[in-house]
Every structure is written in C-alpha cells, then in structure tokens.
C-alpha cells in the first residue's frame, strides 16, 4: 500500500517544520509539500495531488475558511483543520473540512510532538479514507429529516458522530421542531470545543442545547452534548424519564 500523500498548509515556520519532521517518521505518511498561505497551497495541490491536506485557519493573504469555500467546489479533498480554541473551526467544517484538531501552544516541544503523533496522525489516516462526496450527500440527506416529533416523554433520541459529523449533526438538529423528544449527543471533539458547539447549535436551532453536566435532565425540545476529552456521558433512569451522568473514563474506540 502506498503512503498517504499529505500537504501541510501552515504559516508558522516553527510549527510547520515540527509537522514535517514528526509526520515523516511514520512510513504510512509521505509529506509531499508545504505551503505558507492559500495561494502557495493552490499551486501545491495541483502539483502534488495530495490525499489529505492539513490547514491552519489563520493564514496570511486569505484565511483558511475562505480558501476552503473556494477550493472544495473545484478540487474536493479531505482537509484536517488545525485550529486554536475558536468557534471558527465550525465555519471550516461547514466549508468542507472533514475533521479538526486543537492547535497546542508552541512552548512545549515534547507536548507538540506527542500531539502530532497521537492526535494529528490519527486524524490524517482517518481522513484519507473519507469520501468527500459521500460526506456531503449524507449531510444533505440528514437535513431532510424534519418530521420527527414527540410521541412519548420517555423517548430519547441518541446521536453519535465522528469524522465529518459536525455539519451532518447540525443539519439534523436544525430540522427538528421544539417538540422533539430529548436528545443526547456524543460528538468526537477535543476538550473545550463541545461547549462552543453547543452554543452554536442553540443559536441555530429551535432546541435548547447545552454541554451536558451530571444531573441534567433529558427533556423534550432539549439537547445535551457530551463534553469532549476523556469524559463519558451515561443515561440514568429517573422515574419515567432520564438524566445524565458525566464522569472521566478511558477512551472507547479511540
């Protein structure tokens, strides 16, 4: 099997070189090129035809979100966004990125190397298997599910999503009415991002959406999103309904 061809788009020379050095240590990955801004990236895409592109959001000459909006209709490819803790990452997902990782501080080299090997590399390998047309199709189909309504208060809707799933989840939730049974959602995200994602969905939909906390009740018209990181959300039966319990735990399936 040939290695995954990766293009790195990053304006920080220090972080860019760290990405190159650490990704090249894995024989399953071939870094075919780097770019400092979207204009260099455009030329590199045409020259190297990468399987996956990593993309910083904050770039000179054109930001990463605008670049994605221009790129994806003409040259769709799996893109993993590397972003600081900002809700701009969801705009990037909406523009066509398949996944994202939280950009660590540049002050600790060993932590940076661990991040690249244990988080970014995993995302790149998963992204290389993504079918962009399928992801977009699923998002469109999900947006058509607009007629699910409440039948019994004890019903619970469960949503789980990973790579490429944030925009599909958003499309589903925007189609729900306020009489939908209570929703619990597990969305694969780094710590810190789930709270921003919940606020975004709360503003965009007819539901009351929040990041879950222990003791929160699962109520019709409400949606609870499990916190990112190493915490797990568990449903607990209380009378005729449910509430959630959030506690630390080992990762399940990565």
Regions found by a protein language model. Name each.
Residues 2-7, 13-28, 34-54, 58-254:
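Conserved acid/base catalytic micro-environments in cytosolic active-site loops
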């Amino acid at each position: 099997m040939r290695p995954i061809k990766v293009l790195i788009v990053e304006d920080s020379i220090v972080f860019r070189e760290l990405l190159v050095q650490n990704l090249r240590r894995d024989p399953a990955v071939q870094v075919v090129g780097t770019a400092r801004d979207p204009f260099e990236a455009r030329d590199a895409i045409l020259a190297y035809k990468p399987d996956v592109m990593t993309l910083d959001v904050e770039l000179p000459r054109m930001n990463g979100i605008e670049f994605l909006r221009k790129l994806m209709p003409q040259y769709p490819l799996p893109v993993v966004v590397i972003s600081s803790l900002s809700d701009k990452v969801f705009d990037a997902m909406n523009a066509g990125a398949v996944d994202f990782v939280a950009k660590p501080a540049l002050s600790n080299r060993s932590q940076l190397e661990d991040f690249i090997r244990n988080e970014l590399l995993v995302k790149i390998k998963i992204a290389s298997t993504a079918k962009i047309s399928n992801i977009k199709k699923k998002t469109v189909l999900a947006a058509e599910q607009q007629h699910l309504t409440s039948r019994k208060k004890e019903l619970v809707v469960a949503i789980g999503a990973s790579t490429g799933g944030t925009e599909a989840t958003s499309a589903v939730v925007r189609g729900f009415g306020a009489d939908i049974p209570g929703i619990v959602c597990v969305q694969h995200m780094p710590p810190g991002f789930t709270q921003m994602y919940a606020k975004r969905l709360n503003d965009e939909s007819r539901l009351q959406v929040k990041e879950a906390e222990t003791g929160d009740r699962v109520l019709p018209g409400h949606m609870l999103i499990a916190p990112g990181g190493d915490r797990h959300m568990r449903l607990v039966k209380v009378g005729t309904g449910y509430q959630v319990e959030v506690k630390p735990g080992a990762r399940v399936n990565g």
